[in-house]
């Protein structure tokens, strides 16, 4: 996993990313069908309108590497939405579990990020220090957009993919750009909710938002409807909320493309729920136990699925502590990443 540090204006950050790609001789054999290309181009226009900082960053990347900006941006806008479409079905492969919880006076977040193994070697944990936004850590299997993160104010944003109906995909911001937007622009869960309600969303996804006060939600998103789920409370007074690869509310059932169990979503949800219902203390150790299969199925996928946990994370929102296992957490140790805490203390 690469550990980038990016600082400055969108142009400076994009230029640095582009130069990294040039030094690594990175290639981008982008193949998009007509649906993806048209969707991506229209979504890119909306990114420019609603999130110009990210648009300018991508523009600087493509200028630096000499790649046509419109096509490159269209590809980024397809991520977490419709990157692979086969026989009229969205075939994007993502299976992740994320949850937030309180323990006493502190708030925590944890996740397994489950993807095809080839993405492990290009995944990144990026410290962003933009000159027009909040500092944040962005964990991503891509770049510029990402699956999860935490910012200097103790706000966490994370996405989980839910299979969309092809007929309901609309031009808009995809889940991984929504995560980036929240981290850069919002301090609290209430701000995050208002932000998601105001932005055009491209397809089915779940957006988990939590802040250091213990306020936490999952927003189930679709271009035509958004529904907010609120946390449960266990017998010890600890709150928790979980998201997997499904729209769980009855209110959003009409938008579900699959009634199946996407990469064992039901089992993963049950494992997290059963453990969090019993959580009393030892929050970090408890989160590690859940993520590493000690409480039930979470990440032990069969080899023939060509699918695995490529990283796992635990955040303490109250003090900005970040713990990350760069691989399957049942086999890899969690390391402490102090970059965000250090740069926040300096400012």
Where in the sequence are the language-model features?
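Active-site pocket-lining segments that scaffold enzyme catalytic pockets across diverse folds
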Residues: 76-77, 81-82, 90-93
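Short cysteine clusters
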Residues: 96
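C-terminal, well-structured catalytic/ligand-binding subdomain of enzymes
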Residues: 1-70, 78, 88, 101-108, ...
